[in-house]
Curated annotation (Swiss-Prot):
It comes from Anaeromyxobacter dehalogenans (strain 2CP-C). Its main location: cytoplasm. It comes from the Bacteria. Keywords: ATP-binding, Cytoplasm, Ligase, Nucleotide-binding, Purine biosynthesis. This is Phosphoribosylformylglycinamidine cyclo-ligase. Transmembrane segments: none annotated. It holds the Pfam family AIRS. GO terms for biological process: 'de novo' IMP biosynthetic process; adenine biosynthetic process. The keyword Transport does not apply. Belongs to the AIR synthase family. Pathway: Purine metabolism; IMP biosynthesis via de novo pathway; 5-amino-1-(5-phospho-D-ribosyl)imidazole from N(2)-formyl-N(1)-(5-phospho-D-ribosyl)glycinamide: step 2/2. Its EC number is 6.3.3.1. It is found in: Cytoplasm. It catalyses: 2-formamido-N(1)-(5-O-phospho-beta-D-ribosyl)acetamidine + ATP = 5-amino-1-(5-phospho-beta-D-ribosyl)imidazole + ADP + phosphate + H(+).
Length: 345
């Protein structure tokens, strides 16, 4: 009796079918710099160096974490790809880079072309929002490695910034203004805690008061906001001194990453509204407020630091982009040799 790869759990034909299904999603994301299409050994991108004086490539990689567990339970797979792109492109955008292209890694125990196509549909939508091209990826069918119907995702983004326009926080000074920009919800961090607080006791179709009639699944799977185009538009009008993408570690863990040693950001909690999903997690899980701030973005997905004289212009530029933003604090002198962030309640 002969043995085939399919007998071992890997279906090459299903993989080929997935490629055919995702091409219509990927094709509209392609930029003029892309050479060739999906399916080659490597994605080709001809960087237009004439746009830059000193082009610097910027790369980022990330995943979606256990938010995927919520997608599996809800059997919704068309938005986690947006999360994947957001986690990568937001990281490279905060140094001033324009995202140019994106690649994904999709791994599963038993490949379903339909499920995979839904995931890639979301990835393509994320690339559209970010303005970058989906130029390639990898699909891995790994029998016995994942539970049936489950998968993992990783993403890789590459962008470019002109060296003089790099935003690295070195110009941040005492007295600068901290502006917080609204998140869409939990984004893609803290889901192990959120799931423990909520899903051990409530079904995904439960409707908590304050969530605007949405189910728990709706609130938890709200896609991560992609700030890439907003950051670039703001930089065209305001000399932002620092940005921070608020991910794992929350405000206390991420704001200091972009501040010079000897400074601290002091933020006042009362200055911005918090989406109701955070209150639900805190209340139902009896999570201490400090732990909430160390785990979640608490309503601010992006933070910008500007000089006091640029505060009004920054707010005007953000409003023009349709973003909610608030002046949430200021930069003060801190201890020697370190940068910190404190949230005052």
């Amino acid at each position: 009796m002969s043995l085939t790869y399919r007998d071992a759990g890997v279906d090459i034909d299903e993989g080929d079918r997935l490629v055919d299904l995702i091409k219509p999603h990927a094709r509209p994301t392609l930029r003029p710099e892309v050479l060739g299409g999906i399916g080659g050994f490597g994605g080709l991108f001809a960087l237009d160096v004439k746009k830059y004086r000193e082009p610097v490539l910027v790369s980022g990689t990330d995943g979606v974490g256990t938010k995927l567990k919520v997608a599996f339970a809800a059997d919704r797979h068309d938005t986690v790809g947006i999360d994947l792109v957001a986690m990568c492109v937001n990281d490279i955008a905060v140094v001033g880079a324009e995202p140019l292209f994106f690649l994904d890694y999709y791994a599963t125990g038993k490949l379903s072309a339909e499920q995979g196509a839904e995931v890639v549909k979301g990835i393509a939508e994320g690339c559209r929002q970010a303005g970058c091209a989906l130029i390639g990826g990898e699909t891995a069918e790994l029998p016995g490695f994942y539970a049936r119907g489950e998968y993992d995702l990783a993403g890789f983004a590459v962008g470019c910034v002109d060296r003089p326009r790099i935003v690295d926080g070195t110009r941040v000074a005492r007295g600068d203004v901290v502006i917080g920009i609204a998140s869409s919800g939990l984004h893609s961090n803290g889901f192990s805690l959120a799931r423990k607080a909520l899903l051990d006791r409530y079904p995904l179709d439960h409707r908590f008061e304050g969530l605007g009639g949405r189910t728990l699944a709706d609130a938890l799977l709200e896609p991560t906001r992609i700030y890439a185009k907003d950051v670039l538009a703001l930089l065209d009008q305001v000399p932002v001194r620092a940005f921070a993408h608020i991910t794992g570690g929350g405000l206390p863990g991420n704001v200091p990453r972009t501040l010079p040693d000897g400074t601290r950001a002091v933020l006042e909690e009362k200055r911005w509204p918090r989406p109701a999903i955070f209150d639900v997690v805190e209340r139902e899980g009896q999570v201490p407020r400090d732990e909430m701030y160390r785990t979640f973005n608490m309503g601010l997905g992006l933070v910008a630091v500007v000089a006091p004289g640029d505060e009004a212009a920054a707010h005007a530029a953000l409003r023009a982009r349709g973003l909610e933003a608030w002046t949430v604090g200021a930069i003060e002198a801190g201890g020697p040799g370190e940068a910190t962030c404190e949230v005052v309640r």
